[in-house]
């Protein structure tokens, strides 16, 4: 049985156009499990405000939650500047946007690291303030604070990039393995190759579904933004500078994330880009509004048409298959 080497092509070649980016964040939650007998042997009105369901907060929320807020900003930034990939927490970023995204995440990482340094430097001060604020429950809190040296390694903000590829050749199956399983060499090899083929087919289906989903998602973002403008024009509302700015932003966003080449939508967006310049004012210019309405309608017509999505994604894979990995 001969393994079809073309089975790996779609998935491998997808990573000629971008990489997967992951953000991994670690933090100390600054809480401690509640001791049911020691902490909750109280009347409801006497439960101190540092106790929440099942846990005690060891610091005020403005200190405790700052790391989660920075983390969320990082994840939101990555989500907004990438295409969601069907692997947990993975985001596909086209090469043309990779440096921009990495630099943006690095700034957020630097903010996170700076907050960690400040927190650790002020750890004992924050602890003393918390104990003073809850003097009546000091005994319930004081033993909950670990030494600062034990918590500093819990904080991290990591930015990782990778591509996924599968081996072009089968790994040899040792005779020891064959004998151990009491199988003939031929049968073992056939079984292994069949499993590899099935896995490669699954990965290529994943690549196809991802590109199709990316195409649909980017088009839907364009539709949402342009439809807002179409509605304003239809309702005879003023098209503001903020509205025009949103059009320019979605056009740039589409251009930076469209690694697969959605040519027809790109062409219409370029027409719109030429029209919505910084110096155009639509407030009292009926002719300008009419032109804008025409191009907005043209973009919406093309972006809403999903009948060509299979053709767009199919052409992308035909194109990259002409180039060796």
Protein language model features and the residues they cover:
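Generic alpha-helical secondary structure signal
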Residues: 103, 110, 186, 201, ...
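A contiguous, surface-oriented mixed alpha/beta subdomain in the mid-to-C-terminal portion of proteins
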Residues: 176-259, 265-268
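Charged, low-complexity surface segments at secondary-structure and domain boundaries
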Residues: 90-112, 191-201, 208-212, 232-233, ...
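Leu/Val/Ala/Ile-rich N-terminal alpha-helices, chiefly Sec-type signal peptides and the beginnings
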Residues: 1-156
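Acidic, low-complexity proline/glycine-rich segments
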Residues: 148-194
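Short amphipathic alpha-helical coiled-coil/interface segments
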Residues: 105, 109-112, 116-119, 123, ...
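C-terminal structured domains
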Residues: 236-325
